[in-house]
Amino acid sequence: MKNLIALTLLLGGSTLLCAQKPAKTPATYKPVKSEMYRKGWIDFNKNGVKDVYEDPSAPLEARIENLLQQMTLDEKTCQMVTLYGYKRVLKDDLPTPEWKELLWKDGIGAIDEHLNGFQQWGLPPSDNAYVWPASRHAWALNEVQRFFVEDTRLGIPVDFTNEGIRGVESYRATNFPTQLGLGHTWNRELIRQVGLITGREARMLGYTNVYAPILDVGRDQRWGRYEEVYGESPYLVAELGIEMVRGLQHNHQVAATGKHFAAYSNNKGAREGMARVDPQMSPREVENIHIYPFKRVIREAGMLGVMSSYNDYDGIPVQGSYYWLTTRLRGEMGFRGYVVSDSDAVEYLYTKHGTAKDMKEAVRQSVEAGLNVRCTFRSPDSFVLPLRELVKEGGLSEEVINDRVRDILRVKFLIGLFDAPYQTDLAGADREVEKEENEAIALQASRESIVLLKNAGELLPLDINSTKKIAVCGPNANEEGYALTHYGPLAVEVTTVLEGIQEKTKGKAEVLYTKGCDLVDAHWPESEIIDYPLTDDEQAEIDKAVENARQADVAIVVLGGGQRTCGENKSRTSLDLPGRQLQLLQAIQATGKPVVLILINGRPLSINWADKFVPAILEAWYPGSKGGTALADILFGDYNPGGKLTVTFPKTVGQIPFNFPCKPSSQIDGGKNPGPTGNMSRINGALYPFGYGLSYTTFEYSDLDITPRIITPNESATVRLKVTNTGKRAGDEVVQLYIRDVLSSITTYEKNLAGFQRIHLEPDEAQELSFTIDRKHLELLDADMKWVVEPGDFVLMAGASSEDIRLNGTLTVEDYQTRAKAIEAQKPAKRVSTSTNPEDAENVLDEKINTAWQGNKGDYITFALKNGAKVDKVAIAFTRDNNLPATFEIQLSGGGGQFLTVYSGTVSEYGKLISYPFKGTTASDLRIVLNDDRVSIAEVKF
């Protein structure tokens, strides 16, 4: 199929290619109409004058207002909709004369996934002539952009949006592991590089907005979109989301649009129902788990886009909620970008949720709530026309429209569309997309995402010199589809696990392969509840795999899931291996040969039998196009696996919800004795807990130190520890820091992730690590749903997983009153102390001008303030026998002996109390420092 597509591309798959495009793509794109394109600016409205919005040096908000004032209602409403790209809604790959008669003659907000190669779910990539190579693709998007710049009245450029959670979704681009796999790297810098590459390749291809990252937090392992989350911990999701956005938006190369806001990933029973309705969470859990990543990524990374979600929360659809899209998102979080709906989410207000009577009412509710841009699988007319009617009928204020359009224009200005609307470096696109350096980072991401779950008897790594015959089987052994799904690159070359092993062992070992079974059987998913017997064909295929295993030194069985079992609208009722996979594994294990199980899947699986009877297990998730190479490197010891779980593996689906973080004792039942006379009624504990992962080497943790051990709510503490590689191989360790609030006014989590670092250590090498603990780690939502830091003890735990804690210590948080009393108690009995002439110190407080304390340059007098007083001025009476000018400083201290200068000046007048004001703050001590000799202070008043 790939060869056929490639041939079509070479010959040209469109008549427009022959009619409008030169035979060879130029190295640089230059628009045809030169009179619009002035030196240093573009005359978008073609009036011959540099308007404010056309002036790159003008202030951002001034440019927005100038353009908005020139826009008609038709032009404004066209900015509030997405046009789905080629072969979805848009039937043309390049502009046609008909476009001047269609809705977007007045412009369009965004064009989504145009010419990215995706057609529909289950179909092969498009064979259109403009999907590849990169230079031709960029040229085609430029031509579309040129229509909006040159052939619309105001020339407002379009925002080309696209998916990008594992590399930009294009016919070809650098292909990374799925986002769940990327989460398992625990590597902030790597995630930033993934974002940087994805954003850079997107812009070189002509896209300006990437729908990434996914900021949903995984809570139910049955959920179909579990493959798209970073993990279960809101802290980890936030930390990696921040890095992804910083990479994507580097130098404003593209806008990053995080999704799905809000409370999206925990719908009832993991059933999607197309609207993802009725999420099962308390208000406090929504805040602690699901809102937390969005809040931090918006505030700390400046994310420019947010996608609103399909679901309701407590009966209120998010898509129509002013509370979620305006009060919380813009008001509380300070979001300044634009909100785009998930596809058809507006329609769902009346087709699914039943909170609007028709499309017009759904449009009104959405726009009033805070929606800027409607994304849809349908014609943009279906949104824009009722929107215009609402304004004309008085059902919606045009000022509301203005507010929504301001946000859209702000993003377009920020990403440079009004200064450089075209991707002019066409030759650069061919050099940049899938370049060697990017591919190397993709391979490293694949390696770092893989988790070693079991390695009994140190079966792994395999000795390539003594392993002469290897049996490989399983439905995922020679499968590449997991790397070519929607939301990422579609037609790249994939190295399968089989190919990776064959390449690694070439000339050294014989590889015997048979599939063994399909991913699912003919009765699946019903076969999860009814035990259908094996067919003759199924038994014969398993028998072939068994015969290969008997001949081999080791059997590598590659099982898991794929597009049939995981993905959007692919939630499950079981977490067991689907189809005949377990029967295949059991048959291979029964041969008595060493077995290595490799899992390639998009969610945790309950592999209890494998954990008990198979000696070595690797979890690879969907490891990207380089997955086969990465797994071969790990199997044969060229890379030491260091990934750690960001999700919990339940032993059975009956334990769900079963995740991290959790409330104390909420995931374990009473009873310890099994059997007919016991008191145990259900399975307890995780198969593999959050943070778990093995290595080919060992690590020792030591020397935990917390400094300071006592802080106030707005102060921070530093946690230090040492980690040493005590094994014989170099390797990575993900060092995890957890925190527990010992006593609080509400029930808090048993432990919460508070920090992590992935480090690489050679044998016998040690490294000191440090973590900062501050307010964001300590605060809780109190009974009044207010974020507060309550005084008390917090246990800090460093370990190799959430259940493998190696070191712990206690941090104490004091309230301000306790701290003030402690400082007061530590003060000397004397209220005044001096650097010299202490016998005269009290003279400055006796209210007599003729008695004084005298000092020389560098001398000082210090006053202890009562109960941490807030001071913003002090009155001082200076005297000097020669009346020459003298300078001095006023300093404040919050305790601990450190003073900061808050005032420097010259004595205004001698022999008189003069007030000297400064910026006030709470302080425990005030000091007056002399900068000249023989200066006296007669009186001081506060």
State each model region's role.
Residues G755-L761, M785, N850-Q854, Y903-T906, ...:
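Beta-strand-rich interaction surfaces with strong enrichment in secreted/lumenal proteins
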Residues L16-E779, E790-A798, S802:
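Glycoside hydrolase catalytic-domain context in secreted enzymes
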Residues E715-V719, D859-I861, K870-D872:
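Structural beta-strand segments of beta-rich domains
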Residues M1-A23:
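Bacterial Sec-dependent N-terminal signal peptides
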